[in-house]
């Protein structure tokens, strides 16, 4: 990183005490680049939970190759993508850390900041099925609820140890997430779009224009997508 401060932390959302216990949902990823598939499921989760959703770009993801775009470039794309609305918010704290981005560290930090406010970690069905491979995965439930973004009619089969853990924590009513700060699991039926960031990068590298796979704001400044054209 170039030493610039990534100031977006999302503090101050919702003035007054009335909104204090609304859930805060967290949606992580490399966002390399941010595309309409990310935004669609994040927006629907925000509606289903009646929550703010923070998009949290990872610095060095432990389970995949490093992003092609730099942290500053990904932040610029996210800012452009999220302009004009207030329900989806950028939180770039993980980019300020050195080394791998471990979710447990982020949740610990957010819990210290948010007190008893319910936190909801949003995971795609495939990511959830791979949860036992995450660093200290069982401890995640000590700091947040987990919301699994599921495709209607499609069930991802988790391994036995995760299925057992999930069965004891599963709830069907979003209201149950507001009653406690952490520890529950809920499935959220969203409309996933089969959009591939890898394919988008390939198209851009070939000089193509994947206009309707990316948020419109990314085309307002040609420099935003330059990381994938060089």
Segments from the language model and where they lie:
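Cationic, low-complexity basic patches in intrinsically disordered or flexible, solvent-exposed regions
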Residues: 9
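Nucleotidyltransferase catalytic core that binds NTPs
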Residues: 16-230
């Amino acid at each position: 990183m170039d030493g610039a401060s990534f100031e977006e932390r999302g503090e101050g959302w919702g003035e007054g005490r009335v909104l204090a216990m609304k859930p805060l949902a967290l949606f992580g990823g490399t966002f390399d680049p941010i595309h309409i598939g990310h935004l669609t499921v994040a927006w629907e989760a925000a509606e289903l939970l009646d929550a703010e959703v923070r998009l949290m770009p990872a610095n060095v993801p432990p389970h995949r190759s490093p992003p092609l775009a730099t942290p500053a470039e990904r932040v610029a794309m996210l800012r452009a993508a999220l302009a004009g609305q207030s329900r989806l918010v950028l939180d770039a704290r993980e980019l300020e850390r050195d080394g791998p981005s471990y979710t447990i560290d982020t949740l610990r930090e957010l819990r210290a900041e948010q007190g008893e406010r319910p936190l909801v970690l949003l995971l795609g069905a495939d990511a959830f099925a791979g949860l036992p491979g995450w660093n200290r995965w069982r401890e995640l439930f000590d700091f947040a609820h987990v919301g699994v973004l599921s495709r209607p009619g499609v069930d991802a089969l988790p391994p036995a140890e995760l299925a057992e853990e999930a069965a004891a924590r599963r709830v069907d009513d979003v209201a149950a997430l507001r009653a406690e700060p952490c520890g529950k699991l809920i499935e959220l039926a969203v409309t996933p779009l089969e959009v591939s960031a890898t394919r988008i990068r390939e198209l851009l590298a070939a000089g193509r224009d994947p206009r309707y796979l990316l948020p419109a704001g990314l085309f307002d400044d040609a420099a935003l997508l330059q990381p994938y054209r060089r």
